[in-house]
Regions:
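N-terminal subdomain of nucleotide-sugar transferases
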Residues: 1-58, 247
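Acidic anion/phosphate-binding donor-loop and adjacent secondary structure
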Residues: 184, 190-195, 199-216, 236
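Nucleotide-sugar-dependent
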Residues: 235, 288-315
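Membrane-proximal helix-turn-helix segments that form the acceptor-binding/catalytic region
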Residues: 20, 115, 122-126, 130, ...
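Carbohydrate-associated surface elements
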Residues: 37, 178, 196-199
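Conserved donor-binding/catalytic core segment of Leloir-type glycosyltransferases
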Residues: 200, 216-235, 241-244, 257
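A conserved catalytic-core segment of Leloir-type glycosyltransferases
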Residues: 35-100
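Nucleotide-activated donor-binding/catalytic signature segment of Leloir-type glycosyltransferases, i.e.
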Residues: 260, 265-291
Length: 315
């Protein structure tokens, strides 16, 4: 099968879509990826890239077609909006000309933003082939949960866009069974909605702890609680900081380690300083996903948090 994948994010950005394409290749499919210039979550183009190129690459046997976009920058609302709109516009205008090979299926890996599906709908109409949409994030609920948009007018426009995208999808896949009702309510044909959960990459398996002096990780001494992932609005980082402050005097052996990047990393750094938590709360840079099993093994506990929100509870 000839598959045209549309995703604003792709390798070398570390998302599950990379493994999806690799799996398709293993099964003998021919894949073309329509994506943007990698800039997540650093906010600027990765080394070797500019906002305008390179325009074509290869990933395994797959052809990668990149379109220019406005980098995310520091994640401010206007900059993020420009990032979202620029990809949707550039991919809609340049995608049809740059993705000319045979296509049997258009597949959208729909994280945030939902606007990345707009080019796919245009290509579906031009190429007259079916389109599958794999919903990873519900919009506009995600915008509300992340406190990114408060305007009822803007949220209403997003709602109308989402309805149009769902109605024009020949197959809607959802990563959570609790997503089924919201997507059907917004216009997806219930007979064409399927549950497709996410998976853990193959390298997430138990690994032996390194011997003293051999350990490739850098963790403080004590009972280490590791939070590894996006440091964003919905992760409720303030809850972890408050917990660290509460146990600081009674359990000084507990060490909290944050590893990752995101919109609230700067806030986290400032809060650690403001509350004098530097002895027990530590920041580490993000690491490649394939390196994380060793860090997980070295920690005493792994922590995952989401803000108490009805929308986030659907995931």
């Amino acid at each position: 099968m000839n598959i045209l994948l549309v995703s604003q994010y792709f390798w070398p950005e570390g998302f599950r879509v990379n493994d999806l394409v690799a799996g398709w290749e293993e099964r003998g499919h021919n894949v073309t990826v329509l994506t943007g210039i990698p800039n997540y979550a650093a906010g600027r183009p990765y080394p070797g890239y500019t906002a305008f190129g390179p325009s074509t690459e290869t990933f395994g046997r797959s052809r990668v077609v990149r379109v220019p976009l406005v980098p995310r920058g520091r994640g401010g609302r206007l900059r993020m909006a420009a990032n979202y709109v620029s990809f949707a516009l550039a991919a809609s205008l340049l995608g049809p000309g740059r993705c000319r090979g045979p296509v049997d299926l258009i597949f959208v890996f729909q994280m945030s933003p939902v606007t990345m599906a707009i080019p796919a709908v245009i290509l579906r109409r031009l190429r007259r082939v079916p389109m599958a949409l794999w919903v990873q994030d519900l919009w506009p609920e995600t915008l509300v949960a992340a406190k990114a948009v408060r305007s009822p007018l803007l949220l209403g426009l997003v709602e109308r866009l989402v309805r149009a995208l769902y109605r024009r999808s020949d197959l809607v896949l959802v990563q959570s069974e609790k997503f089924v009702e919201p997507v059907v309510r917004r216009g997806a044909d219930a007979a064409r909605v399927r549950y497709l959960p996410n998976w853990a990459e193959s390298f997430y398996r138990p690994v032996p702890l390194a011997k003293d002096g051999d350990d490739p990780v850098s963790l403080p001494r004590g009972f280490v609680i590791l939070f590894a992932g996006n440091l964003g609005e919905v992760q409720s980082l303030e809850t972890i900081v408050e917990a660290a402050a509460l146990v600081r005097s009674e359990a000084p052996q507990i060490q909290w380690v944050f590893m990752g990047v995101g919109r609230r990393r700067a806030w986290l750094e400032e809060e650690i300083l403001r509350r004098g938590l530097g002895a027990s709360v530590h920041l580490r840079d993000a690491r490649p996903a394939e390196a994380m099993p060793v860090w997980a093994a070295a920690a005493d506990a792994l922590l995952v948090t989401l803000r108490a929100d009805p929308v986030l509870a659907l995931t």
